[in-house]
Amino acid sequence: MYLHRAPRRLTIMSIALSLALPALAQQAPPSLAAGAAVKAAPVDDKTIQKVEVKGAASSYDARRDDTASKIVLNHDEIIKYGDTNVLDVLKRLPGVTVSGASGRGGEIRMRGLGSGYTQILVNGERAPAGFSMDSLAPDSIERIEVIRAATAEYSTQSIAGTINIVLKKAITKAQRELKVGMAGGKGIINPNYNLQMSDRKGQLSYSLTVNGFHNRFDRDTPSVDEGYDVAGKPVLYRATVFQEKGGYDGVNIGPRLNWTFANGDTLTSQSFINAGRFKRDAQSDEMTSIGARPPYPSLDWKVTNENYFFRTDLNWVKKLEAGAKLDLKIGGVIGALRNDSWRDAYLVRGGRHLLDSYVKTRGTDKGYSSTGKYSTPLFEGHALSVGWDGGYSQRDDSRKQNEAELFAPDDKLYPTYRPINVNEDYKGEITRLAAYAQDEWNVTPRWSVYAGVRWEGINTAVRGSDFADSKSRSSVWSPLLQTLYKLPDTKGDQVRFAITRTYKAPNVQQLIPRRFTSTNNSPTEPDYQGNPALKPELALGFDASYEHYWGEGAMVSVSASIRKIDGYTRQGIVLAPDGRWIQLPVNDGTATTRGVEFEAKFPLKSIMKNAPAIDLRANFARNWSSVDAVEGPNNRLDQQTPFSSTLGVDYKLGQLITGASYSFRTGGPVRVSDRQGIYQSARRDLEMYALWKFDPKNQLRVGLNNVLAQDFISESSYRSDNGIVKSRSVSPGVVMLRATMEMKF
């Protein structure tokens, strides 16, 4: 087995800012599912959060010039390290972290918060349930926008912030490019390809992007369960060997057509097709040396999963008199999910077959949407826009679980297991409507103000075969204010301030009282069940920042933020009347989160005239939070990442471009409730890349990921009147080598 060692701590000197501000509270609407969230307005054209007078287009910088704070990562930065997974790109962005072990997916977090606090959009909209961000290839992305403070044009379900991933669109010249790559490490092999084609013929332009990948893995995840009574005496020790192998195949297709008419109007058709197939074979063997044994120490799993997603939009932009513009968009989406899971149980590996279990899940998503925005200069110095966002979404799910105990264990040391047989169906519908108005006012050449208000209303209806029907109707008003002031007698110094009202609505899985069972049920391996009484969370936020720009590509910024959250949701664990442990979401009072961030990036030539072509970048984020209903210390909100940092360097020498990035995030213990606890190890990632240009049409990109090969350790614990139980697992780190040949033709 392994030893649990505390990682070394990193000492960082940073500027500490703190704000203490009051909070507001208001009922906010529940949401049906991640895929049915409020849809944002189009993102293809410039939004009104831009200063109206910017000078030459070549000098425009969204980070510097937009009144509403936003960080934009362009396509060249996205593909720099040769990543095949968009999550690996996001973890290098300032103030963004991805939880979990490197290369195993994870949750995207801003300000150290995930679980719905960070809003993730694709082309301004949330994808439906079943769509995996892991399947989105970086080559298909045009840009990534990190929006720290909410704006009225997007849904305000963004307490921590919004990350908007904008897919590629047509360009003005013909282009054909093929990329063929291979990535591999211990037990992992990932071949992939990307084809991009675009051209223009008269008033019509088109583009087509195709990405494909074939990922295979073979890995172990060992774990240990320990228990102690109130006197500290060991009452449980169980070691588990978990082995799994399988793969994931996927393809993404993105066609786009654009017509430009003589009067300047445009009509755009854009679609996105995603298909993926996952397969996994796994086995686990539990060896108990102290305490009670589980019902079935040896288990075999086989899982297959297929998901399909198709979205299409038609966007018409009409230019009107006096600089006004009308932007209309309609869209439709369909998706399907097929999941099959087989589970066989034994007392010992190779022994008598005791339990046979099969779970069949089927799901479909469909919906349509409509958005519109009218924008006009209105008065001198003002950029006003009003708009709407409406739609309908439907989710149908069926789940059948059939279990048969073939033989009961003869040994009385093994607890009795009751086979579970269920046949469940549910249908969820959501009808939504949002309206907003926003204005950006250039008060003076140095001072601009953004003000907006958004109303969102949502009606939900959920029906199921094993729970009572439920309906809800709710709405929320979100007033928003942001301002940018460029300090006098300076060329590049400016300050920002923002006040936002945002919220977090529960998703459909959190609301439906349908139970998902575990085989060896315990406080650290509970069943899961939704809570129909769950309420949304509402937050009042304040952001402030100082920025200094002193040359092309050179800047430094310091920012601070605070969020006061009412109706905080945590995961509780209860013992049901049938004797099984159940985890379910519950509202538990208020919570507060504060944070400071520091970012700097600059070419070395900006401070040393004759320096080589080296670009440097660094960012640090420190977060604090507390949940009022949970006694400290370590009563952090949503397992918040306390500290994260990234250091990077890029160097160009002739035909060679190379660089490296080092990321660090702390972990540590978290008190979820007076009885529950969680621990995660600190995480260190070192990545390197090199790009060699053979000629203008051919180049080779090589990258190394997770060079330090650090293991990821996580632990959960539950304390009762009889003592404490802990479960600790290790995800081994793997160094990944990537090579991609890029060819234009």
PLM features per residue range, with description:
Residues 87-125:
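Extracytoplasmic beta-strand/coil segments of soluble accessory domains associated
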Residues 336, 459, 471, 485-541, ...:
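Surface-exposed extracellular loop regions of Gram-negative outer-membrane beta-barrel proteins
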Residues 98, 109, 125-150:
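Short acidic/polar hinge/loop motifs at secondary-structure boundaries
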Residues 50-81, 106-109, 115-118, 171:
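N-terminal periplasmic "start-of-domain" segments of outer-membrane beta-barrel proteins
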Residues 301, 305-309, 424-431, 501-557, ...:
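Outer-membrane beta-barrel signature, preferentially recognizing the C-terminal barrel domain
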Residues 86-89, 106-109, 146, 158-180, ...:
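N-terminal periplasmic accessory domains that precede
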Residues 444, 449, 555-569, 582-670:
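Gram-negative outer-membrane beta-barrel transporters
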Residues 2, 497, 540, 605, ...:
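Conserved C-terminal beta-signal and adjacent last beta-strands/turns
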